[in-house]
């Protein structure tokens, strides 16, 4: 039977689904205590990512080899509704929910994805926010402080009665950042999260149990983050430097979500769940975009790729020399995103002859989203390593357009269970109308005189089928076949990204050892790349066809408890390994030069071939100790074959984190966390422009109190 806002709901469902899935429970999230979603997901097989800012503010997540840039090729949801700023028209996740306010995370991969879209190739990540208590009054307060003047305050209070429940939550995260400007200015962030939920419930003995829940969420971020990295030489000597020309860079962002959920069980066999949602995300990322010397303007990535070729430009970026007026251009990437819609799903199940279980789930969603760009570029000069304003740009001159999408999606999923066999065929339909209205560079009032429009429409049928066969409580086999889909852009005639995806796996339990082993193969007929500034592009968001690609891989998950028979102490160990081979099957050259010149046999950028994670926990009623280690394999930022030099390469790294918790009383606990235990200096990315370091050694201590 369907649940209101969840995909899985618990680990048992995840282990019995006809497709690869993972349920990251509340206990796991609490034991890790991460604010960085990348670190929270690192133990999940099939999840690839590359870091950018060291705190996970804007993650780049890939599932099974999808393009990771800004997590724009996976379906992101919070409480069962789409949460990316504009999921169809501009899916790049410049907003990502704070992992600290989540009570669980659900990851779905493989063949049973037709219920969720629009991105069906890699998978789904559904973030489950804190829920009201099931009974009585509950409250919690936790705080921490540590390296780089970083602090957190997280508190909530909730109550549940027979007909009413509510939860109010507050989260504040702050840091001065670990990168250093010579001026000593802050390079960190300030984030505030507020959430409220109120649920009206029918009586427990009602013939038709139902509830109506209203959710409000507010998010505010001010982060002094930049796209400007540093040169390779400077990275090798002072990896945490920030150049003077980035001192004005900052992201000012705000997100508001309104959501209404209604759930009714008409009978024990028939249930309907409806969501109405409205998300608004506004942001202005004011950041350096170019440098001019002697009337020669160069992009940041051009200068940092070869500083010796542009010594004067490079000196201005570092603040080593005074410049002319308007030597530095800082772009106001000012955008407002809207995402709203209504979705409903119904579930009816029954038992037929010979004990065969049948379940039919049907869902539909009407959705609209848009990205409104109104951007400009200001001029600055450098004097004594300080930036001084010299000119104000014309509003709208660097982007004055609205991209939008109207989408209707529906699906039907049938499930059959007989003895140990489960089958789940399904079909999804996506009908999408994408458009763009460009008002021109010199039309701040947006009259129709300079308006140019374009439109693209597509309707896609997305079938899939999965199976699971349980031989015993210790062994099952599952697999499936489904069509992968990713919406195109608004360029007329542009085709969607399509693939045929296969998977086959087994779940097993042998004594203290349990786990799963999965093989997958994704056959792309036309992989779509996106021109994102975050990956070194121009930021137009236009998509380009990268041709045929084969992505194959293996996922291994092992769980073993060293002290399973010890009542006083538990020592669970988890090992996760992912092998991913993402290979181009054709030649092409990207006009945007994001991936470089591609030849058959080259590896798709940003996808490491190997990665593994090993975690060990020591659990006692008075204390907990968690050790987590991860090896991230080498990857390239441009297409590469096995013999390519390291010019565009991000080397592998091995990082260990440690956390501990001590229970002073039943309600009061002390916490401690060490990030990057051995203080490894490691490169996480060469994009958007220059070298970027990972989080250095950091110590954080805190206090938790529950009522």
What does each model-identified segment do?
Residues 337, 354-361, 365-369, 398-524, ...:
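Structural signature of Gram-negative outer-membrane beta-barrels, strongest in the C-terminal barrel
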Residues 205-213, 253-439, 558:
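Face-selective signature of the C-terminal outer-membrane beta-barrel domain
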Residues 81-109:
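Short acidic/polar hinge/loop motifs at secondary-structure boundaries
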Residues 417, 472, 544-639, 666, ...:
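Gram-negative outer-membrane beta-barrel transporters
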Residues 1-30, 38:
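Short, acidic, small-residue-rich periplasmic hinge/interaction motif at the N-terminus
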Residues 145-174, 182-226, 250-254, 260-266:
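Transmembrane beta-barrel wall of Gram-negative outer-membrane proteins
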Residues 112-114, 124, 128-159, 170:
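Short strand-turn segments of transmembrane beta-barrel domains in outer membranes
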Residues 38-81, 85:
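Extracytoplasmic beta-strand/coil segments of soluble accessory domains associated
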């Amino acid at each position: 039977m369907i649940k209101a806002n969840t995909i899985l709901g618990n680990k048992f469902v995840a282990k019995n689904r006809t497709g690869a899935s993972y349920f990251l429970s509340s206990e796991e999230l609490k034991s890790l205590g991460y604010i960085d979603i990348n670190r929270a997901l690192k133990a999940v097989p099939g999840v690839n990512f590359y870091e950018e800012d060291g705190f996970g503010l804007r993650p780049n997540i890939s599932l099974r080899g999808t393009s990771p840039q800004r997590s724009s090729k996976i379906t992101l949801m919070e409480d069962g509704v789409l949460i990316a700023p504009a999921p169809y028209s501009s899916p790049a996740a410049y907003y990502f929910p704070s992992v600290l306010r989540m009570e669980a995370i659900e990851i779905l991969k493989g063949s049973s994805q037709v219920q969720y879209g629009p991105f069906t190739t890699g998978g789904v990540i559904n973030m489950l926010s804190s829920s009201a208590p099931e009974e009585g009054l509950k409250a919690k307060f936790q705080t921490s402080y540590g390296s780089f003047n970083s602090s957190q305050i997280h508190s909530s209070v909730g109550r549940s009665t027979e007909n009413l429940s509510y939860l109010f939550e507050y989260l504040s995260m702050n840091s001065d950042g670990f990168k250093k400007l010579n001026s000593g200015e802050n390079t960190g962030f300030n984030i505030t999260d507020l959430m409220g939920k109120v649920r009206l419930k029918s009586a427990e003995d009602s013939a038709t149990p139902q509830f109506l829940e209203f959710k409000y969420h507010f998010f505010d971020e001010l982060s002094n983050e930049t796209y400007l990295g540093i040169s390779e030489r400077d990275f090798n000597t002072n990896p945490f430097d920030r150049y003077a020309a980035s001192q004005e860079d900052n992201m000012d962002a705000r997100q508001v979500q309104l959501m209404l959920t209604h759930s009714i069980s008409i009978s024990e066999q028939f249930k309907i769940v409806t969501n109405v949602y409205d998300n608004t995300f506004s942001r202005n990322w004011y950041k350096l975009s170019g440098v001019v010397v002697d009337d020669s303007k160069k992009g940041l990535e051009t200068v940092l790729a070869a500083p010796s070729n542009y010594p004067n430009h490079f000196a201005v970026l570092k603040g080593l020399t005074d410049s002319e007026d308007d030597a530095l251009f800082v772009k106001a990437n000012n955008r407002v995103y809207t995402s709203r819609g209504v979705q409903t799903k119904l579930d009816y199940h029954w038992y037929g002859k010979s004990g065969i279980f049948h379940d039919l789930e049907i869902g539909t969603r009407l959705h609209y989203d848009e990205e409104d760009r109104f951007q400009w570029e200001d001029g600055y000069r450098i004097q004594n390593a300080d930036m001084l304003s010299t000119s104000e740009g014309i509003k709208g001159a660097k982007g004055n357009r609205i991209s939008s999408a109207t989408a209707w999606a529906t699906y039907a999923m049938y499930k059959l269970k007989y003895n140990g066999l489960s089958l789940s065929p399904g079909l999804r339909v996506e009908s999408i109308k994408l458009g763009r209205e460009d008002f021109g560079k010199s039309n701040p009032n947006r009259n129709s005189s300079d308006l140019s429009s374009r439109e693209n429409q597509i309707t896609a049928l997305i079938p899939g089928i999965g199976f699971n066969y349980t031989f015993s409580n210790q062994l099952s086999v599952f697999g499936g076949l489904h069509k992968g889909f990713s919406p195109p852009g608004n360029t007329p005639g542009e085709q969607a990204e399509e693939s045929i995806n296969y998977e086959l796996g087994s779940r097993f339990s042998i004594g203290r050892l349990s786990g799963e082993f999965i093989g997958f193969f994704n056959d792309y007929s036309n992989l779509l790349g996106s021109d994102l500034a975050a990956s070194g592009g121009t930021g137009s968001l236009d998509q380009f066809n990268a041709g045929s690609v084969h992505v194959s891989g293996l996922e291994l998950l092992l769980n073993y408890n060293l002290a399973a028979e010890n009542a006083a102490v538990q020592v669970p160990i988890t090992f996760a390994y992912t092998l991913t081979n993402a290979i181009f099957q054709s030649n092409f050259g990207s006009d945007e030069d994001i991936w470089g010149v591609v030849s058959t046999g080259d590896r798709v950028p940003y996808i490491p071939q190997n990665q593994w994670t090993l975690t060990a926990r020591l659990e006692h009623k008075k204390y907990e100790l968690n050790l987590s280690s991860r090896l991230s394999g080498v990857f390239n930022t441009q297409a590469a074959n096995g013999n390519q030099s390291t010019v565009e390469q991000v080397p592998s790294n091995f990082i260990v984190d440690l956390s501990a918790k001590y229970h002073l009383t039943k309600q009061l606990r002390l916490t401690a966390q060490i990030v990057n235990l051995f203080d490894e200096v490691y490169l996480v990315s060469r994009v958007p422009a220059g070298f970027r370091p990972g989080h250095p050694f950091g110590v954080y201590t805190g206090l938790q109190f529950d009522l």
